[in-house]
């Protein structure tokens, strides 16, 4: 074999080997790039899911906070409305005639079956016919006065019957709270 042919054959083998190595490295590079692109896409998806979950949690937290603020404000408004109702009842009671006013207390004393005891008036009470009630129900009038918007307390031994305007209005509201709530919510 001639030297030229050997060189030519070696050149051909060299080019073939170079081409094989080049193709192999190109394939490895393409596989590496594909693997890294896949990892990048998986990482992006994971970050998207994580961000979406975080946003959902923050949205839920914000919604819960807003609902809590709304309910607190609603409760404050309802409480104010109930306080206004109580004040209106108190004003109506105070502005009623002496006859009507005393009839209310007489009905309350009858309901409680009062037969004797000590009557303690509130500081603001000035419409009750004390002499009439003391005589009819065998009550003694205390020199002391107590806090309140009207009415009185009857004490006998260990028994205390609170017939103050504040207590009666509070009991009236509590007894009718469901109906009041329905009115406040526009259900009636």
Curated annotation (Swiss-Prot):
Q: Does the keyword NAD apply?
A: no
Keyword Ion transport annotated: yes
Extract the GO molecular function terms from the UniProt entry. Answer: ATP binding; proton-transporting ATP synthase activity, rotational mechanism; proton-transporting ATPase activity, rotational mechanism
One BP annotation, GO: proton motive force-driven plasma membrane ATP synthesis
Q: Which Gene3D superfamilies match?
A: ATP synthase, E subunit, C-terminal
**Record-linked InterPro entries:** ATPase_E_C (IPR038495), ATPase_V1_Esu (IPR002842)
Q: What keywords are annotated for this sequence in UniProt?
A: ATP synthesis, Hydrogen ion transport, Ion transport, Transport
Its Gene Ontology cellular component terms are: proton-transporting two-sector ATPase complex, catalytic domain
- Please give the family membership noted in the entry: Belongs to the V-ATPase E subunit family.
Its function, per the record, reads:
Produces ATP from ADP in the presence of a proton gradient across the membrane.
HAMAP family for the chain: ATP_synth_E_arch
Q: What is this protein called?
A: V-type proton ATPase subunit E
Q: Which organism is it from?
A: Dictyoglomus thermophilum (strain ATCC 35947 / DSM 3960 / H-6-12)
Biological classification of the source = Bacteria, Pseudomonadati, Dictyoglomota, Dictyoglomia, Dictyoglomales
Q: What gene name is listed for this protein?
A: atpE
